[in-house]
Amino acid sequence: MTKNKLDLIFKSYDIRGVYGDSIDQDIAYKIGKAFAEFVPDDTIIVGHDGRVSNIEMLDAFTSGIKSINKEIIYVGLVPTDTVYSLSGLLKKPGAIITASHNPKNYNGLKLCNAGAIPIGENSGLMDIKKLADRNVEIRIEKFQNNDKYLGNEYYEHLKNLVSPESISQKLNFGIDGGNGVYLVRYLIL
């Protein structure tokens, strides 16, 4: 049964499905473990968007990562670009728990190698799928941020990219609300 679910949720460039149906905590655990085995690094960046099922997904996915003794840099509730930016800056692999533009009952994952190199169908995603398609003991624990949390440091980094003094003219700007993480706007401004 898991194999059929994996066939349904592994897409060309990400993993997504209806939460509680085609993707659930057991599958998230297996994918977390498989991703941690696939990447050579000992530390993985993890963030999530604002979906209701993300806490359950976070618990399961990070439990899978920790099952092989890898560390997590938790960035919290962020847009997808934050995980990719930190992956590039820190040269660490990353994962964002999100189903992107899909309806609210969906959830999934976008994965990248160190340096923000996306993992897709032809660059390791099918290898991760094979690793996830094994019978493993599943031990899901409530995620506790005992590892590193870089959310605040990242927002400070963004705020320091441009100093208010360097802007000498009236500034017009736009806000992209398309990624669904309104809290980030509040933290940055």
Question: Which role fits each region the language model picked out?
Answer:
Residues M1-S63, S67-N69, Q144-L171, G177:
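An N-terminal, well-structured beta->alpha segment
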Residues L6-R16, G20, V75, P103-L109, ...:
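Generic secondary-structure boundary/loop-capping signal
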Residues V18-D24, A36, R51, T80, ...:
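Short, electropositive, low-hydrophobicity segments enriched in small/polar residues
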Residues D26-Y29, D59, G88, G120, ...:
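Generic secondary-structure boundary signal with a strong preference for alpha-helix termini
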Residues F35, L90, A132-N135:
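Alpha-helix boundary/capping residues
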Residues F38, I72-V75, H101-P103, E121-D127, ...:
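Short, surface-exposed, polar/charged, turn-prone segments marking secondary-structure boundaries
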Residues P40-A114:
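Ferredoxin-reductase
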Residues N107-L189:
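Gly/Ser/Thr-enriched, mixed-charge loops and adjacent short helices
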